[in-house]
Amino acid sequence: MTTNSGITKEWVDETVKPGDDFFRHVNGKWLATHEIPADRPKDGGLYTLRDNAEKHVRELVEKIAKEQPESRIGALYNSFMDVEKIEADGLEPLLKEIAPILNSATPSHLAVTLALLSRAGLPQLFAWYTSNDPKDPKNYTFFLYQSGLGLPDESYYREEKHEAACAAYVEHIARMFELTGLAEGFGLTPEQAAQLVFTHESELARLHWNVVENRDAEATYNPYQATELDEKFPGFPFSQWLLALGADPETLGQVIVAQPSFFEGAAKLFTSIPLMSWKLWAVWTVLRSRAPFMYDELVQESFNFYGKTLSGTQQIRERWKRGVGAVEKALGEEIGQEYVAVHFPPSHKEKMLVLVGNLLEAYRESIESLDWMTEATRQKALEKLSKFVTKIGYPDKWRDFSALELVPGDLFENLRRTGAFDADWLIARKGQPVDKSEWLMTPQTVNAYYMPPANEIVFPAAILQPPYFNPDADDAANYGNIGMIIGHEIGHGFDDQGSRYDGDGKLESWWTEEDYAKFKERTSALVEQYNAYVPVGLAPKFHVNGELTLGENIGDLAGMSIALKAYRLALKKQGIESLADAPVIDGMTGIQRFFFSNARGWCTKSRPQHAEVMISVDPHSPDEFRVNGVVRNIDEFYEAFGVSEGDALYLAPEERVRIW
């Protein structure tokens, strides 16, 4: 048995009681002294691993770019890094891209142009993708989703707390039109053009569903035949748009429209708003999307708004970092194949499989002992749990990029080609059987996910590193950290939305009405708790949205509770009968190390501007509440740190939420 605790206590702030603020007790000294690097809005936690992964990917990319400049990776990276050519090209690449917009003489012509721009990887009025059909999860289907905004979310256009951001956005649009001279072609000053674009986007924002509505798996599943979209949503030529996209509506068949009222309203606006306004807005969408890839003056202005104003970031990322990011976005699996060959030992996968096995066993035991669930629902829950698919490290089959040809020295052409390649790949999958080997993240991504229609949990190689996963450390540290993350992802299968899918990934209820009512009662209590939380340093109006974050909060609470049970199981398999008998290491009991390790994993610090954006749009709670909001609902936390009535985190036993 190891005596390596896997944790250190140098950041502990002894002036903060664990029962008042466990997050700051564990991390207080770091939070008080750490300076966020100038080129990012947030630091700590996962960012250390992301820095490591980025450094490793850079080494691979630059080696390939130097030795094989004609390769896809070499062509894309070198074209991004060729600053001299980009500066010399000036506005010319953008003018070529917007020429079809300016030449669109009719709404139908413009609709075709918007589709072609979408094929080039540019966001437009409607977003689209193909993925597992929630009602037929063995096959891919085609989804249509609301889009068209330049601010993070529709709430920015209507809520008073975002007025300053809106004013800055209008100024930014005007500045971009001033730098490019593009407003003149419309007979407008930059200021007039900016106001017209903002008014246009505000009209679209009024039609958008909000972030809570968009979480509803049933409400956003609305099937239509592709051939009937013109009739169902009159005003926009969907058939022509789909054809230009590369998807023939006659063969496309059924499509899923996520927000029908948005599509109905946007289609009406397409004919009621003057064509000139639509063309100006379309020019703006291309300009804001391509600006980060253009000459320095536009790059800096884009960063000044999206980086500095919205996120508080003080300095743009070094060019190599942005270049690596561009390669990752376009060719993630191709570089991922190189990454895992060097940076993922097979032993990590073996250890992870043991952890996952214990987490699944702990979930099974927990479900079997739930006192609020009837036997009928319990059996369905256990059936779903038994069908979970676990993917660790990297895909068994890699995506084939051989049909993609990129051009050395032409960044914009490479961006268009990668966009079209992705579009064709996605469209070709419609109606085909789901490729069960597919991953939605690359191996070098520091993250993890659960996919409801596949009922699978996925852990890329890059997250399987200290402090989250340390194969040489004591079990308490690993179960408190990566164990909780595993439990969190499994927990998504049983959160307020994931619980609507059965074991085969089908969006179909398996609950009795009585049990679902009891489940809702417990989750509603969690919503109330989180609605009351305001991150330190923000005004009360920036409180957590308990409805938006509910799924992640259920995942956090379930993940922590079940990881603790799994730690108990691991101890028993080593002949240790109880948590109390776990070894004391570095002056801490096993249960203390478990909670301590978890709090260290969430140790992050955000700039206020970034925190304000994320509180509005991110379905995850701020990291301080991913610690404090969870532990106060777990009885063992009270025992481990002597938390009692009067402490800030104290909840009476009957107020503690217990779900899974």
Where are these regions (language model features)?
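Short, Gly/Pro- and small/polar-rich lid/capping loops
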Residues: 1-10
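Active-site-surrounding "flap" and adjacent substrate/cofactor-binding loops of secreted or lumenal enzymes
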Residues: 3-4, 16-20, 25-88
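Hydrophobic/aromatic-rich, well-ordered segments within soluble, folded domains that form packed cores
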Residues: 11-32, 157-178, 550, 557-562
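Extracellular/periplasmic catalytic domains that process cell-envelope and extracellular macromolecules
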Residues: 14-18, 134-136, 450-453, 587-589
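Short, solvent-exposed loop/turn and secondary-structure capping segments
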Residues: 33-37, 128-129, 153-155, 208-210, ...
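Short secondary-structure subsegments characteristic of cysteine-rich extracellular domains
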Residues: 38-61, 187-207, 478-484, 586-587, ...
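Noncatalytic, helix-rich "gating/capping" subdomain that lines the substrate-entry/channel surface
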Residues: 61-354, 358
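Intrinsically disordered, low-complexity linker/terminal regions across diverse proteins
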Residues: 197, 203, 256, 260, ...
